[in-house]
A protein has these predicted regions:
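N-terminal targeting signals for Sec/Tat export/insertion, comprising classic cleavable signal peptides
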Residues: 30-63
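Disulfide-bonded cysteine-rich modules in secreted/extracellular proteins
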Residues: 32-37, 93-103, 153-163
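Boundary at the C-terminal end of the N-terminal hydrophobic targeting segment
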Residues: 18-25
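Bacterial N-terminal signal peptides
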Residues: 5-16
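Small-residue hinge/turn detector
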Residues: 49-50, 110, 170
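Accessory alpha-helical DNA-binding modules that contact the DNA backbone or grooves
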Residues: 52-97, 113-156, 173-212
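Short amphipathic alpha-helical boundary/capping segments
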Residues: 42-46, 103-107, 163-167
Length: 213
């Protein structure tokens, strides 16, 4: 009975949030996804050059913020330059599986906030992050932090609105995602979506998804 009441309470709390809080990928406030930003816009950012922007685009997609961080470090950017750049571009981190080091790459996240991120795992929805982290920061800081994270979307049940929060997923690819429902395994997703995009892009999209019930 207690579990049922807790589940009902959670449902009510999540339902009580504005629709934007339901999105499973944090809404951009100051950043653009590093895998989808144009080369021209990238070249204008602090610490970037046209040559570095071109090289970064050629190396995409990056499947984690760690991979992007290694690229930028290898390109000779200082930690200060990289941190400043992460105020403008980033690769979302999975709230449920990101390593401590990945989370600490989010600008302004120190050991104290890291503990709060980890304390509430596993996150059933981004609304849980919104509710729990709201205890520690104001609304502006909450929105800033939320833009760096995501909770995987269920490939079989996610709404159109939620799926469209995946960076770079437009209405055409949304139709392809839905056409092959229900998916009986991730291999089918890879096979079917691989008809339309490269295997690297399939892997980039896949990181935002789950088939777990």
């Amino acid at each position: 009975m207690t579990r049922i009441l807790v589940a009902l309470a959670f449902t009510v709390v999540v339902a009580g949030y504005p629709q934007s809080a339901h999105a499973q990928v944090g809404k951009p406030v100051t950043i653009v996804d590093a895998n989808t930003i144009t080369e021209a816009d990238l070249a204008k950012l602090p610490g970037m050059t046209p040559a570095l922007a071109k090289d970064l685009v050629a190396k995409r997609p990056f499947l984690s913020i760690t991979a992007l961080d290694q690229f930028l470090t290898g390109a000779g950017l200082t930690r200060e330059q990289i941190t400043a750049l992460y105020g403008r571009i980033f690769i979302h981190v999975n709230l449920n599986s990101a390593s401590r080091d990945e989370i600490l790459l989010i600008p302004g996240v120190g050991n104290r906030m890291l503990r709060e991120f980890l304390e509430y795992r596993p996150y059933a929805a981004l609304a849980v992050f919104h509710r729990e982290i709201d205890k520690y920061v104001d609304d502006a800081e909450l929105a800033r932090l939320e833009q760096y994270v995501f909770v995987p979307l269920n490939l079989n049940t996610a709404s159109d609105q939620d799926l469209l929060t995946i960076p770079g997923l437009g209405t055409r690819m949304l139709r392809e995602f839905k056409e092959y429902r229900p998916y009986d395994g991730i291999e089918r997703f890879r096979r079917e979506i691989g008809k339309y995009v490269s295997k690297e892009e399939v892997a980039r999209l896949e990181r935002y998804l789950t088939l777990a019930k």
